[in-house]
Amino acid sequence: MNNETKRTRLTVQDMVRLSVLVAIMLLLELTGLGMIKTAGLEITIFLVPVIVGAIVMGPGAGAFLGGVFGCISFWECFGKSWFGTMLLGINPVFTFLVCVPTRILAGYLCGLTFKALHKLDKSNLWSFGAAGLIGALCNTVLFMSMLCLCFYHTEYIQGFVAALGSSNAFLFVIAFVGVNGLVEGAVSLITGAAIAKAVMYSRGKLAARKTNA
């Protein structure tokens, strides 16, 4: 009976945490802080709550929060994002595929990665940062792969290809992501991992693990 109560309580706690993270993502969207634009860069902050949820609550939570991120991204295609608006005008279905499933899978893979790495990281030193970095990498790779699959041969994307001087899809991805991808990776590695680790300490998970070790 106690075990069942404990499992129920943990489930409720996770639902509360998910609600808080979703609220943070919506707040980021409403305030315009979810996408920081400066010096030609667009740094995605939405990925941080996804990474935190994936690390703290597992792949399922990561997938759910990734879905929220994807839906917000798709919503921005209706006027807020000039790039997304152009894609939506070309093909709405493909635009949805670029925005939503890629983020769901990125969140899921981030949680799955942390689950695997954390078993090896007995010192709790590197698994958080590695999962955050891989989460950002998965988001970028999946997004750009779907973008190329769905839109690479369109006149709009070919305009970018010509402007960047890319001779193939791979070089286009490298040139298009560039410094932006590196900065997002650093933000996810440092911020997402640090917050997730702090939350897990507050839950007593890491402390209990060290005691058992």
Predicted feature locations:
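Loop-helix junctions at membrane interfaces
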Residues: 1-213
